[in-house]
Design a protein with these regions (language model features):
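Acidic/histidine-rich alpha-helical segments that form the ligand environment
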Residues: 14, 18, 23-27, 81-119
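Short amphipathic alpha-helical segments, especially helix-boundary/capping motifs
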Residues: 8, 19-24, 35-39, 79-84, ...
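Short, contiguous alpha-helical
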Residues: 32-78, 122-157
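Amphipathic, non-membrane alpha-helical segments in soluble helical-bundle scaffolds
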Residues: 5-16, 40, 44, 89-96, ...
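Short, helix-capping/interhelical loops that line the mouth of catalytic, cofactor-
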Residues: 1-10, 56-99, 157
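Generic N-terminal initiation segments characterized by hydrophobic and/or small/turn-forming residues
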Residues: 12, 107-110, 138, 145
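Alpha-helical bundle segments that constitute or directly flank the non-heme di-iron/ferroxidase center
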Residues: 3-31, 53-64, 139-142
Length: 157
């Protein structure tokens, strides 16, 4: 049990750290509207997408799994959502600060959970059943990390 607790504490720290690193990396890009090589989006679009997926997908799934009995989630089409909701005029700094604040609030929720809260179950229309709250936290971290690496590559050109 000690190792599991340590893993979860580390997971929360990594989630906060990667969110802050993502913000810093995005803000260090000279022109966030320049298309990225090999990518369909620019840094501003990636930042908006990452913030929206935190709020509408992984963050929401963590919250609902913590509060509801075995909630069911449907798939999220990030491309379609961006096509309909993307605002290129949205301040990059403001949206990234909003993103980091959202992650910090999520971590506060996680810190307040009893150990068994991390094992609460949920379902997904295509992924099936038995998905724990911890699974959604891990997927959130992986999603942010993936986009952080993309932005880092753009910065290291």
């Amino acid at each position: 049990m000690k190792e599991l607790i340590e893993y979860r504490v580390n997971l929360m720290k990594r989630l906060e750290d990667v969110a802050k690193a993502f913000r810093a990396e995005c803000l260090s890009v000279k022109d966030p509207y320049t298309p990225l090589e090999g990518e369909s989006w620019n840094v501003h679009q990636i930042a908006v997408h990452t913030r929206d997926v935190d709020k509408l997908v992984y963050g929401l799934r963590v919250h609902r799994t913590a509060l509801e009995d075995n909630p069911e989630f449907s798939s999220f089409d990030g491309e379609a959502y961006m096509a309909e909701h993307y605002d290129p005029k949205e301040s990059l700094s403001a949206l990234l600060n909003d993103f980091v604040s959202s992650i910090e609030a999520l971590v506060e929720l996680l810190r307040g959970l009893p150990a068994e809260g991390w094992s609460r179950l949920s379902r997904h229309t295509t992924l099936g059943s038995g998905l724990t709250l911890q699974t959604w936290v891990e997927k959130s971290l992986a999603h942010i990390q993936e986009h952080l690496e993309t932005v880092k590559k753009a910065n290291n050109k």
